C-alpha cells in the first residue's frame, strides 16, 4: 500500500478551492493509496484531518491535531501532536501539495519539501515560482519565442508614489479596453476588465489588494482556450483544446469557474490553433514543469498567444483539468499524476 500525504487548504484566497480539490481527490483515489490528509488553516497551521467535510468549498479548521514536520532531511514521517499532549507518528511515501495561490503553488511549499528532501507531486521551486508570477512568465516565454501579449508592470510599492506617471505611460502605450490583474494571484481574483481610462486607477488598486504587483495588458476580443498536460509513463500527453461557455462576466472569473453552470466544448472549434500541442509542450519544458499543468491561450487571427501557466490547476469536479481528458475518468487522471510522481521517487 502506498501512502500519500495530501496537503490542502492554505493561506491564499484560493483556500476553499484547494479544499474542494482535496475532497474530490479523496472521493475518487484508487484503493492502492492510503491518504493522510493534512490541512493548512488560513493562519498557516498544519493540522492532521481524520475526516474532510462534505461541504464543497469548506475551510480547514484548527482541530488541535498539530503536524510537526521532520527535523532531518530524508525522513518521511510526520508527528501529530494532539491537544491533550499525546502524539503519534505517521509515515508517508509521497506528498501531494494540492494547494492553489500564494504559499502553495508559488514555490514556497515546494522549497520547504526540497529542503527536507521529501518527494512531492508537481513542479519544483523554479517552475512554480516562474509560472505564478505572470511578469516573469511573460519574460521567460517571450525569450523562448512563444507569443505573449504586451504588458505593463506596476509594482505595488511604487504605485502610490508615481500614480500619475504610471497612468500616462499606460494610456500612451495601449488603447482601451484593457485587462488589469494581480501579478501573482489565481482563480481570477483581483482581475478587472477596463473599458475607459477613468476606470483604470480603481482597477489597479483592486489588483494590488490581491497581489504584490499588477499587470496591465490589452483586453483581446478573442476566445480563451485551455490545454491540460500530464506526464504518462515518461511521455507528455496533451489534452484537446477546451473552450468554456459561460454567461455573466466578460471573462472566465471565479463565479464562472466554481459557482455557476458552464459548458466545456471539447475539442474547441476555432481556426488558427494548429500546433497547439507543440506550443504547450514547449511552454511546459521551458519552465521546467513536471507531472501536470494547464496552459491557457488566446486564439487570435495570427495564432495562439500565451495567457497563463497553471502548475497546480484545480482538481474539483467542475475544474477544466480533469474534464480535458475525455478518454479518462477522474480517478484515472489522478492515478496518472500520482504514478508519474511515484515513478520518479522509486528511481
Swiss-Prot record:
<comment type="function">
    <text>Cell wall formation.</text>
</comment>
<dbReference type="InterPro" id="IPR011761">
    <property type="entry name" value="ATP-grasp"/>
</dbReference>
<dbReference type="GO" id="GO:0008360">
    <property type="term" value="P:regulation of cell shape"/>
</dbReference>
<dbReference type="GO" id="GO:0009252">
    <property type="term" value="P:peptidoglycan biosynthetic process"/>
</dbReference>
<keyword id="KW-0067">ATP-binding</keyword>
<dbReference type="InterPro" id="IPR011127">
    <property type="entry name" value="Dala_Dala_lig_N"/>
</dbReference>
<keyword id="KW-0436">Ligase</keyword>
<dbReference type="GO" id="GO:0046872">
    <property type="term" value="F:metal ion binding"/>
</dbReference>
<dbReference type="Pfam" id="PF07478">
    <property type="entry name" value="Dala_Dala_lig_C"/>
</dbReference>
<dbReference type="Pfam" id="PF01820">
    <property type="entry name" value="Dala_Dala_lig_N"/>
</dbReference>
<dbReference type="InterPro" id="IPR000291">
    <property type="entry name" value="D-Ala_lig_Van_CS"/>
</dbReference>
<feature type="binding site">
    <location>
        <position position="308"/>
    </location>
    <ligand>
        <name>Mg(2+) 2</name>
    </ligand>
</feature>
<comment type="similarity">
    <text>Belongs to the D-alanine--D-alanine ligase family.</text>
</comment>
<protein>
    <recommendedName>
        <fullName>D-alanine--D-alanine ligase</fullName>
        <ecNumber>6.3.2.4</ecNumber>
    </recommendedName>
</protein>
<dbReference type="InterPro" id="IPR013815">
    <property type="entry name" value="ATP_grasp_subdomain_1"/>
</dbReference>
<dbReference type="InterPro" id="IPR005905">
    <property type="entry name" value="D_ala_D_ala"/>
</dbReference>
<keyword id="KW-0464">Manganese</keyword>
<keyword id="KW-0133">Cell shape</keyword>
<keyword id="KW-0460">Magnesium</keyword>
<keyword id="KW-0547">Nucleotide-binding</keyword>
<dbReference type="GO" id="GO:0005524">
    <property type="term" value="F:ATP binding"/>
</dbReference>
<dbReference type="GO" id="GO:0071555">
    <property type="term" value="P:cell wall organization"/>
</dbReference>
<feature type="domain" description="ATP-grasp">
    <location>
        <begin position="138"/>
        <end position="339"/>
    </location>
</feature>
<keyword id="KW-0961">Cell wall biogenesis/degradation</keyword>
<comment type="pathway">
    <text>Cell wall biogenesis; peptidoglycan biosynthesis.</text>
</comment>
<feature type="binding site">
    <location>
        <position position="310"/>
    </location>
    <ligand>
        <name>Mg(2+) 2</name>
    </ligand>
</feature>
<keyword id="KW-0479">Metal-binding</keyword>
<feature type="binding site">
    <location>
        <position position="308"/>
    </location>
    <ligand>
        <name>Mg(2+) 1</name>
    </ligand>
</feature>
<keyword id="KW-0573">Peptidoglycan synthesis</keyword>
<dbReference type="GO" id="GO:0005829">
    <property type="term" value="C:cytosol"/>
</dbReference>
<feature type="binding site">
    <location>
        <position position="296"/>
    </location>
    <ligand>
        <name>Mg(2+) 1</name>
    </ligand>
</feature>
<keyword id="KW-0963">Cytoplasm</keyword>
<dbReference type="InterPro" id="IPR016185">
    <property type="entry name" value="PreATP-grasp_dom_sf"/>
</dbReference>
<dbReference type="InterPro" id="IPR011095">
    <property type="entry name" value="Dala_Dala_lig_C"/>
</dbReference>
<feature type="binding site">
    <location>
        <begin position="171"/>
        <end position="226"/>
    </location>
    <ligand>
        <name>ATP</name>
    </ligand>
</feature>
<dbReference type="GO" id="GO:0008716">
    <property type="term" value="F:D-alanine-D-alanine ligase activity"/>
</dbReference>
Amino acid at each position: 500500500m502506498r501512502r500519500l500525504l495530501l496537503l490542502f487548504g492554505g493561506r491564499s484566497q484560493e483556500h476553499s478551492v484547494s479544499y474542494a480539490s482535496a475532497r474530490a481527490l479523496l472521493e475518487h483515489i484508487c484503493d492502492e493509496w492510503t491518504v493522510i490528509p493534512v490541512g493548512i488553516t488560513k493562519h498557516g497551521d498544519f493540522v492532521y484531518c481524520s475526516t474532510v467535510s462534505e461541504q464543497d468549498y469548506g475551510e480547514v479548521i484548527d482541530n488541535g491535531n498539530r503536524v510537526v514536520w521532520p527535523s532531518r532531511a530524508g525522513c518521511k514521517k510526520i508527528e501529530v501532536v494532539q491537544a491533550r499532549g499525546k502524539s503519534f507518528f505517521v509515515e508517508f511515501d509521497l506528498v501531494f501539495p494540492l494547494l492553489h495561490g500564494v504559499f502553495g503553488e508559488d514555490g514556497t511549499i515546494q522549497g520547504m519539501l526540497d529542503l527536507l528532501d521529501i518527494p512531492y507531486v508537481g513542479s519544483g521551486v523554479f517552475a512554480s515560482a516562474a509560472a505564478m508570477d505572470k511578469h516573469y512568465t511573460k519574460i521567460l516565454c517571450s525569450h523562448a519565442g512563444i507569443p505573449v501579449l504586451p504588458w505593463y508592470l506596476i509594482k505595488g510599492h511604487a504605485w502610490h508614489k508615481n500614480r500619475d506617471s504610471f497612468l500616462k505611460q499606460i494610456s500612451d502605450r495601449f488603447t482601451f479596453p484593457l485587462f488589469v490583474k494581480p501579478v501573482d494571484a489565481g482563480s481570477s481574483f483581483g482581475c478587472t476588465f477596463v473599458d475607459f481610462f477613468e476606470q483604470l486607477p480603481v482597477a489597479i488598486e483592486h489588483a494590488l489588494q490581491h497581489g504584490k504587483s499588477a499587470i496591465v495588458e490589452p483586453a483581446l476580443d478573442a476566445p480563451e482556450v485551455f490545454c491540460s498536460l500530464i506526464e504518462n509513463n515518461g511521455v507528455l500527453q496533451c489534452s484537446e483544446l477546451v473552450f468554456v461557455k459561460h454567461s455573466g462576466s466578460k471573462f472566465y472569473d471565479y463565479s464562472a469557474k466554481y459557482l455557476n453552470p458552464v459548458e466545456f466544448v471539447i475539442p474547441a472549434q476555432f481556426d488558427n490553433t494548429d500546433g497547439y500541442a507543440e506550443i504547450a509542450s514547449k511552454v511546459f519544458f521551458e519552465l521546467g514543469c513536471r507531472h501536470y499543468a494547464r496552459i491557457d491561450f488566446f486564439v487570435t487571427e495570427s495564432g495562439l498567444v500565451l495567457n497563463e501557466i497553471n502548475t497546480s490547476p484545480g482538481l474539483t469536479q467542475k475544474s477544466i483539468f480533469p474534464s480535458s481528458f475525455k478518454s479518462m475518468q477522474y480517478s484515472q487522471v489522478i492515478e496518472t499524476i500520482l504514478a508519474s510522481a511515484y515513478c520518479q521517487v522509486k528511481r
